């Protein structure tokens, strides 16, 4: 039963990491470049709507789950006496936490909070600088999320290959 629980946690963690990597990737390669062509007023209105819509229960569960489930998978692996697997999940979880969750909380969210107060009819003079900083941080979290997803896929494939 322990091994089954550890396996299920590792699969769910991997899926959540993949969903979030895809979410950030789609925004980085499609949405952000499209929005770079908008004037200040259109950009502010669009980004404000995106920020309103993205705050929902489904996204919240996926976003917070992707930060917590790798750590749960690590604990489950340690519980099954799979020290190396546990350490690998711990590394994935910590890298993801720092490069996605922490970065989001310290860079993207403060910019989103400031942007929520802006008036589209009278944008601040530094709106493009804030947009570029947000996009730079999003690009970093995109790469980190993709790397963590790939690491999780490899980890699940390697560990399942050894147990079958």
Positions of predicted regions on the chain:
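Hydrophobic alpha-helical transmembrane segments
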Residues: 57-73, 131-148
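Interfacial segments of alpha-helical transmembrane regions
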Residues: 2-18, 75-99
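Hydrophobic residues within the alpha-helical transmembrane core of Major Facilitator Superfamily
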Residues: 18, 71, 98, 150-153
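Hydrophobic alpha-helical transmembrane segments of integral membrane proteins
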Residues: 91-113
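Short, charged juxtamembrane terminal tails flanking transmembrane helices
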Residues: 158-164
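Internal alpha-helical transmembrane segments of multi-pass membrane proteins, especially GPCRs
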Residues: 11, 52, 91, 132, ...
